[in-house]
Amino acid sequence: MVANDQEQIKIAREYFTRADQGRPDVLELFHEDAEIYFPKFGFGFGRNSFLEMVKGFEGVLEYIQHDYDRLNFIPSADYLIVEGTSQGRMSGKSWAGGETPGGRFCNAFKFRDGRIMSLHIYLDPDYTGEDEARFRWGKNRKW
């Protein structure tokens, strides 16, 4: 890995920490023209669109904690792919990536000028497995 890769990993780690703690200064990590993608939210443009996306969880997300020690970082030039798991509680129900259907994710970061220019988050937003009708293979799977 080159120095730039290490800097991008450092920024991504800081993003997960600040986001999990609900810190408003998470926005400082984003470029002012950042692009955000999240399932069911779609695309947002500008760093404040991150807050717009987060507002969709108000009143239901009690907490989220990414498993920092289990994050896999795949750097490539201006991009950093991060695969991992999270745990949390939403509307009184808990999830834990690797143990429940929800909680696995993959984030694609793109950097410009030392900031997050693009963040695309790929996951199933049904963290707690409420959408039982679409568990076509049953719930007795290895997660």
What feature does the model see in each segment?
Residues 23-77:
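A solvent-exposed, acidic/Ser-Thr-rich amphipathic alpha-helical stretch
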Residues 5-15, 38-41, 62-66, 117:
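Short, mixed-charge, low-aromatic patches
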Residues 12-15, 25-27, 34, 50-53, ...:
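Hydrophobic pocket/interface hotspot
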